[in-house]
Amino acid sequence: MKIFLDTANIDEIRQGVEWGIVDGVTTNPTLISKEGADFEKRIKEICELVQGPVSAEVISLKWDEMVEEARKLASIDDFVVVKIPMTPDGIKAVKILSAEGIKTNVTLVFSANQALLAAKAGATYVSPFIGRIDDNGNDGLRLLEEIMQIYTNYGFETEVIAASVRHPMHVVEAAMIGVDIATIPFDVLKKMFLHPLTDVGIKRFLQDWEEYKKNKK
């Protein structure tokens, strides 16, 4: 499984890259606005740090405006993946952009039907929002299973990104069914390192080592 960071914060991205476990980054207008940074400069900076796919989202809602905006975003860096909303206009834009070789990530996906249409249009990635689905009383994991089965049945090359990840178990559940990518908030990524027995074990090793040194004197 590939791990993307869902953030526009440079310090978080730098830390993830230093850990050696981050394959890409996803951003959205909300994340960028929180940073108070220039949009294009921040996307370029992230691309230089990660050296992997970096999703940057269009603001337009009409297909022709999406295409124009997507071309500009794609020109920022070769690593840019253009996020397109799951709408009829969005799918039309994805079809055009895919034919031009521009990588796309269809976002705000909440059903297998939507994921099927995104793959048919040639999307590079599709992002089901599993956390929001769970929040709404439905089963985000079940949606991932449906999408993975459909893509396997027909040999679609579109990669699935588990998005709207709320906790480490979302990552485990996605990994167990073979989802290609999880895009993870930095706080959730940090939690993936943790287990109380690991802390207990480290403490015990250190205590034993100190005891050993005392006995050697």
UniProtKB/Swiss-Prot annotation:
GO molecular function (one): transaldolase activity
Active-site residue list: 83
Pathway membership: Carbohydrate degradation; pentose phosphate pathway; D-glyceraldehyde 3-phosphate and beta-D-fructose 6-phosphate from D-ribose 5-phosphate and D-xylulose 5-phosphate (non-oxidative stage): step 2/3
GO cellular component: cytoplasm
Enzyme class: transferase
Keyword Ribonucleoprotein part of the UniProt annotation: no
Keywords for the protein's UniProt record, in alphabetical order: Cytoplasm, Pentose shunt, Schiff base, Transferase
InterPro entries named among the record's database cross-references: Aldolase_TIM, TAL/FSA, Transaldolase_3B, Transaldolase_3B/F6P_aldolase, Transaldolase_AS, TSA/FSA_arc/bac
Subcellular location(s) per record: Cytoplasm
Cytoplasm among keywords: yes
GO biological process terms held by the UniProt record: carbohydrate metabolic process; pentose-phosphate shunt
Catalytic activity: D-sedoheptulose 7-phosphate + D-glyceraldehyde 3-phosphate = D-erythrose 4-phosphate + beta-D-fructose 6-phosphate
Documented EC number(s): 2.2.1.2
Family stated for the protein in its record: Belongs to the transaldolase family. Type 3B subfamily.
NCBIfam families with a match to the protein in the record: fsa_talC_mipB
Function comment: Transaldolase is important for the balance of metabolites in the pentose-phosphate pathway.
Name assigned to this protein: Probable transaldolase
Protein's organism: Fervidobacterium nodosum (strain ATCC 35602 / DSM 5306 / Rt17-B1)
Lineage: Bacteria, Thermotogati, Thermotogota, Thermotogae, Thermotogales
